[in-house]
Amino acid sequence: MFKFLAKGLLRDRTRSFFPILIIASGVMLTVLVYSWMSGFSVMLIYESARFGTGHVKIVTNAYNELIDQKPYDLGLMNVDDKIETLSQEYPDVHWQPRIYFGGLLDLPDEKGETLSQGEVIGFGVDLFTDSFEHDLLNLEEALTAGSLPTKNGEILISQEIAEKLDINIHDVVTIIGSTMYGSMAMDNFTVSGMILFGVQAMDRGAVIVDISDVRSFLDMEDSASEILGFLPTYNEAKTFEISKVFNETYFDEDDEFSEIMIPLRTQGQMEYIIATLESYMASFIFVFIFIMSLVLWNSGLMKGIRVYGEVGVRLAIGESKGHIYRSLIYESILIGIAATIIGTS
């Protein structure tokens, strides 16, 4: 019967053209908007993970209470041992220590007097021992001038802050901050390159420094602000599962320096942002399909009037009502399948 109905639809375009056109257009627009919003959500998660949240994040209980301030004086200690233990317990997760700090970037003249000065946000990442951070942060693609650091004492600065302070490649700059214990810290660094990520928060005043230099600068030997964990591919359910197991083992609410693992979705405003995107996608699909259903319903009513005579003839020659009804349903299914294939291709 399907073959017979398919031939009929192909030969009589008036029965199939407009329904297929309407359904194909609706499917195409629904898939297009859903794919765009899904892609935006994936990119949001990707950008958040690589710059700040990781897929999971380990911090101290006290740090978590003030996490928006990034208080590295409440950070993790004995980080190398912790990462070794984590790698054994969660071999599928790649662990990276990070140090976030703020300070003043000072450009001195030949006499050591200040030429220009501005606030910067420092990122202490592992630049030398492996290439994971290079790939994660896309440093080679983000590089706009100069080269990546090849030795200790070299740093990357955002192109915007470089232009603002009139800093050139190979200039020696001074970063002024405070150590983990609250005393003043100053150290000189050589600008090896300039970067532009296309992310406003980073481009406004980011400084990328190797974590070993930051540890020496801030008196944070074998310490880190946070430890970020990255799965091979982001899996929200798995991040919650890993966090639950870790927190049941290591987290003590009464100990301010006990470690707590936080999945990406529950960090900052991510829960609200992701939930809002999901609700927008669901609402759009529901509303659009509902409107398309009304249009098709109206089209079906008009078609019913048109084929009224045809149905009467079929009944008159002895065709059963059930057979006619089933053939109309099969015809609708064929139109829906054809339109869906056209709309998604």
Q: What name fits each language-model region?
A:
Residues 9-25:
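Membrane-interface helix starts
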Residues 13-15, 303-312:
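Transmembrane helix boundary and interhelical loop/hinge segments in multi-pass membrane proteins
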Residues 24-35, 39, 289-292, 303, ...:
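Small-residue faces within membrane-embedded alpha-helices
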Residues 28-58:
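Alpha-helical transmembrane segments
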Residues 36, 233, 238-293, 303-305:
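Peri-transmembrane interface segments
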Residues 61, 71-208, 212-222:
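A structural signal for hydrophobic secondary-structure junctions
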Residues 66-67, 73, 196-198, 229-238, ...:
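Structural beta->alpha junctions
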Residues 301, 310-345:
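Transmembrane alpha-helical interface segments in multi-pass membrane proteins
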